[in-house]
Amino acid sequence: MTSISQTTTIAAQATAPGRGGVGIIRVSGPEAKNVAQAILGKLPEVRKAEYLPFLDCTSTDKTQVLDQGIALYFKAPNSFTGEDVIEFQGHGGPVILDMLLKVILAQPKVIMAKPGEFSEQAFLNDKLDLTQAEAIADLINSSSEQAARSALHSLQGDFSKLVNEMVESIIHLRMYVEAAIDFPEEEIDFLADKKIVTDLKAIISRVEDVRKQAQQGSIIREGMRVVIAGRPNAGKSSLLNALSGKQTAIVTDIAGTTRDVLAEQIHIDGMPLHIIDTAGLRDSDDVVEKIGIERAWQEINQADRVLLMVDASEDHSILEDDQDIKDFYPEFFAKLPEKIGLTLIRNKADVNDAKTGFTEFTDTDGTQHAIITLSAKTGKGVDSLKEHLKTIMGYQGGTEGGFMARRRHLVALENTHQHLLTGLDQLESYVAGEILAEELRICQQELDQITGEFTSDDLLGKIFSSFCIGK
C-alpha cells in the first residue's frame, strides 16, 4: 500500500469525555506546527515534554491563558499517524478542554476529527495494517483480561504475521503453477508434480488452523452464543436463571411454560456469553407454541454451542456403554448441524441425589461428548458448567492469549479455505492448472482484505467509524 498525503489537519479530545485529572487534545496534520506556534507561542522540541501555558490566540491580545500543561511534538513520519502531531495535555475539566479545542479549531485548515480518523491516518500512512487498527478499538472495548491480551497481540502484529505468511505461501505456489502453464513445452509436467499437491495441502492445513484460532478470537471479542435446548420441563429456564444469577425466566411445573426465546448476556471471569433459553421441543398443535419451537430451531442453527438438557431423574439409559447419544434423541440430532458443538446437561440431580460435575461419554463410533450433571434448582454442579464454557471459549488465566478476530476475518478465511479446496479438487481430478491459478489469486485477494492490502473504501469507512473520537 502506498502512503497517502494528508492535506487536512484534524483535532479532537483523545481522552474519555467527562471530568478527570488529565485531559488530552491531539492535533495531527500539516498545520500541527502552526497550531503549536499559535497556542504555545513556540514549537516544542521533538519528543521532549515541555510545561507551557496554553494561550487563547483568538483573544484580542492573544495572551490570555486558557490552561497550562504538557505539550508534546512528534515530527512526521515518526508519530502514531505518520503526520506531524502535537498533543496538549492539560487539566481534565470538560469546560477547559472545550475552550481549548474551540481555539484549535479556529485555526486555518483545522477540522474536527471523525471517529477513528487518527487511526485511519495511521493506516493510510502504513503505520498500521487494518487488523492492528481494529485491535486498537478492541483493546479499548475489551471486557476481560483475556480479551485485552488478545487485542494487544493483534495490535503487536501476531494476526497480521500469520496472514502475511499464508499470503507468501500462496504467492510462491502461484508462481510455480503459472510457470507450469506458461511453459507447457517443458519436458517435465510441473502440474503433475507432487510438490504442488503437497504444498497446496500444507497451505490448506495452515488456513484451517488459523481459521480455528480466529474463531476463538471472534468468540472472545463478540461473545459465544449458547442455546439451551431440550424437551419441555427439562429445566431450561431454571438453568438460564442459575447462569444469569437472576430470575430472568418464569419457572413452573407446567410443561411448555416458555413459548418464546429469552436471552441474557452474562460474563464468566470477564468472558462474554449470550445465553438463550428456548421453547421445549416437541410436536404441538398449539399455534403459539409451534411458533416458539420454530424460533428455537432458528436459534439452535445460529449457536456456537448447544446445551441439550435432559431430565436426569428420568433418563438414565443414555449413559450405558452400548448406547449412542444420538440414539437417545434421534429427531433432535437429525436436525442439528454437524458444525455446532454440543454439551449434554443432565439436570435435576437433586431429585435422586446424583453425583454432579463433568464427565465424558464415548459413543460406539469413538466420538466423545461432554456431559455435565447438575441441579439448576439448587445450583449444585453449575460451577462445573461455567468452567466447561470457559474452556470452550479458550479462556486462559495466565499471561498468554491468542489474537482478536472479527466476523469479516472469519468470512475471508472461510472463503480462502473453500477456494483452496476447489483448486485442489480441480488439480487432482482434471490437472486444471488455469483454474488452480485463478483460485489461488482469489485466495490471495481474500487474505489481503484482512490486513487491508486490498480493501474497498466502503469497508474502511465502516471499520473506522466504529472507533471513538480521538483514536
Curated annotation (Swiss-Prot):
Membrane spanning stretches: none
Gene Ontology biological process: tRNA methylation; tRNA wobble uridine modification
Record keywords, A-Z: Cytoplasm, GTP-binding, Hydrolase, Magnesium, Metal-binding, Nucleotide-binding, Potassium, tRNA processing
Single annotated GO MF: GTP binding
Record domain TrmE-type G: where: 223-394
E.C. designation(s): 3.6.-.-
Protein name: tRNA modification GTPase MnmE
Protein species of origin: Colwellia psychrerythraea (strain 34H / ATCC BAA-681)
Chain's gene name: mnmE
